[in-house]
């Protein structure tokens, strides 16, 4: 039996707000009773793994205020501005310099100081730290960088959780690479616990289920974190808009079903409002026709702290990836991806996806 039996050794790429909420969240729920239900997790004990079994053993970043520092310090450093939910003791994990590639956009480059340390050999670090699962939290638009780390995961035999909208698990070529290597992947693009995507998806489906014709809809998002600042660079946004849009329209059967590019569907980030910090405000409108073609419109606003809203979902994704690794399963984990991600290889209705994931957990 391995000396690390019973734990999940996790590496993080990108020590931003999402990583901060993840690390704090594991600390927050460390002593949770496995027989209770807590906000934001499917189960305190997910298969054989309790939240406290998630152990951070490596981290990569490019920010000079994070590289070279203990993970417990780095999660509160530089531009990180999410809500604090836990004191994190020193981890003895020093954040290492990853390769930049296309991970730094124009607005990032204007805001942070990039570390002048030499990039490390990522595959070597993953192997030496005996990492089980690599979580990619790179900024939106980091196509080349995300694929670099995905390949590192394959080369090191490490399960991959792809939290950003770069299409890897949902790309048949990449899916086959993971399958052939016997390496599991959960992706792509993390769904929040209750965010703009899931509420919009549910309300749009409700219109159809109640016989209302959905003619047009929009979802506008503003936030104050580095994610929203980065997304002001419209060229980095394409995959994000596609991911958020198909997450809503894939669940429909009417005129807007499966639409990504359509005049009557507009879903995406809109602006950066610095004083919101890590809060995100979503403004959603649905316009339809009810009985007699009479207009029926719904408008709502959602206010959330952005990063904690997805941290629990990542904890579940990490545990699903480790269970797959334990069972020798390679390639996309379809049930986990469908329930936990916006752009999985196979879209399923949320209730169906959850039921399939429960079945997967039970084995």
Swiss-Prot record:
This is Inositol-3-phosphate synthase. Belongs to the myo-inositol 1-phosphate synthase family. The keyword NAD applies. It catalyses: D-glucose 6-phosphate = 1D-myo-inositol 3-phosphate. Keywords: Inositol biosynthesis, Isomerase, Isopeptide bond, NAD, Ubl conjugation. Pupylated at Lys-65 by the prokaryotic ubiquitin-like protein Pup, which leads to its degradation by the proteasome. SUPFAM superfamilies: Glyceraldehyde-3-phosphate dehydrogenase-like, C-terminal domain (SSF55347), NAD(P)-binding Rossmann-fold domains (SSF51735). GO terms for biological process: inositol biosynthetic process; phospholipid biosynthetic process. Key enzyme in myo-inositol biosynthesis pathway that catalyzes the conversion of glucose 6-phosphate to 1D-myo-inositol 3-phosphate in a NAD-dependent manner. The keyword Metal-binding does not apply. Disulfide bonds: none annotated. NAD(+) binds at residues 70, 129, 149, 192, 227, 240. GO terms for molecular function: inositol-3-phosphate synthase activity. Its EC number is 5.5.1.4. Was identified as a natural substrate of the M.smegmatis proteasome. The gene is ino1.
């Amino acid at each position: 039996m391995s000396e690390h039996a019973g734990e999940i050794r996790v590496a993080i790429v990108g020590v931003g707000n999402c990583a901060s909420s993840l690390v704090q969240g594991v600390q927050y729920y460390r002593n949770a009773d496995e027989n209770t239900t807590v906000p934001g997790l499917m189960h305190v004990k997910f298969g054989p793994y309790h939240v406290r079994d998630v152990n951070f053993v490596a981290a990569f970043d490019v920010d000079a205020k994070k590289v070279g520092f203990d993970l417990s310090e780095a999660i509160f450093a530089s531009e990180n501005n999410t809500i604090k939910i836990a004191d994190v003791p020193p981890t003895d994990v020093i954040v290492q310099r990853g390769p930049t590639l296309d991970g730094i956009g124009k607005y990032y480059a204007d805001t942070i100081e990039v570390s002048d340390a030499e990039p490390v050999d990522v595959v070597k670090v993953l192997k030496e730290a005996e990492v089980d699962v690599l979580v990619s939290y790179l900024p939106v638009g980091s196509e080349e960088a995300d694929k670099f780390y995905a390949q590192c995961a394959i080369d090191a035999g490490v399960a991959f959780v792809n939290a950003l909208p770069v299409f890897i698990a949902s790309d048949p070529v990449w899916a086959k690479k993971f399958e052939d290597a016997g390496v599991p992947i959960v992706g792509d693009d993390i769904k929040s616990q209750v965010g703009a995507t899931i509420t919009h998806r549910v309300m749009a489906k409700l219109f159809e289920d109640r016989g209302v014709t959905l003619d047009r809809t929009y979802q506008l998002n503003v936030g104050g974190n580095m994610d929203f600042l980065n997304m002001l660079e419209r060229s980095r946004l394409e995959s994000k808009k596609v991911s958020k849009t198909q997450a809503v329209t894939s669940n429909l059967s009417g005129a807007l079903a499966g639409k990504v590019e359509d005049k009557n569907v507009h879903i995406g980030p809109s602006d950066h409002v610095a004083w919101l910090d890590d809060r995100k405000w979503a403004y959603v409108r649905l316009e339809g026709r009810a009985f007699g073609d009479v207009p029926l419109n719904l408008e709502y606003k959602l206010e959330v702290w952005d990063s904690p809203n997805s941290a629990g979902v990542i904890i579940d994704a990490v545990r699903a990836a480790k269970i797959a690794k334990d069972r020798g399963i390679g390639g996309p984990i379809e049930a986990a991806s469908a329930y936990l991600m916006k752009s999985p290889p196979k879209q399923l209705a949320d209730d169906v996806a959850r039921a399939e994931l429960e079945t997967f957990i039970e084995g």
